[in-house]
Amino acid sequence: MAKKLVNKIIIVGCGPGSMKFMTGHASQYIKDADVLVGSRRLLSLFQNSEAVKYTLNRNYKQLITRIISLSKNKSVVVLVSGDPGFFSYAKLIVDKAGIENCVVVPGISSVQLAFARIGRTWNDACFMSLHGRTGRLAELIRRVREHEKVAVLTDNSNNVKLIARKLLDEGLKERKIYVCENLSLNKERIREFDVTSLQRVQVKGLNVIIILDEESSE
């Protein structure tokens, strides 16, 4: 069991992007924080906060030690995008500090919003993140073969064109794909494609794609 901290580390899910999707519970913890830890994008949402700010980039493991140290006499809130339980920094913190020293505040994930936008349920979906990960396309293909719904977090390296080419190479051209860009933001865009046409689409940044096997669900 981890040593008990004076102040619990608060891990807050900030939602898919827009402040209007952040819960009131999350906002209150952030308002009361002495220290905010998060990515530059998330910290920029709270420029008016008087809390001391620590930027999270590739310094994950080193920063955990700092967070634990700061929690001895300060209220530390760690900001994560979406929901803390969905491909986030939360697991590293909980594993290191112990759940007895943490409070995890859920948020709305980009995947939840993506499924809401296309009017589909997500309780029967398979989820995968390619964000910042390499060599995972074979695993993606396996999951697409095994599941009728697969939601994927993409990035510039693992982009939709690359995924479309891989699906075609593997004989999976009959899938329907929704590309969900800038979810909750002003430039939000939801588009539907077949695999062949998706090869011609240029999509940048972090996005959610939902791959559907419509034939199996009929």
Residue ranges and their predicted role:
Residues K3, N7-I11, V76, E146-E218:
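A contiguous loop/helix-start segment that scaffolds small-molecule binding in enzyme catalytic cores
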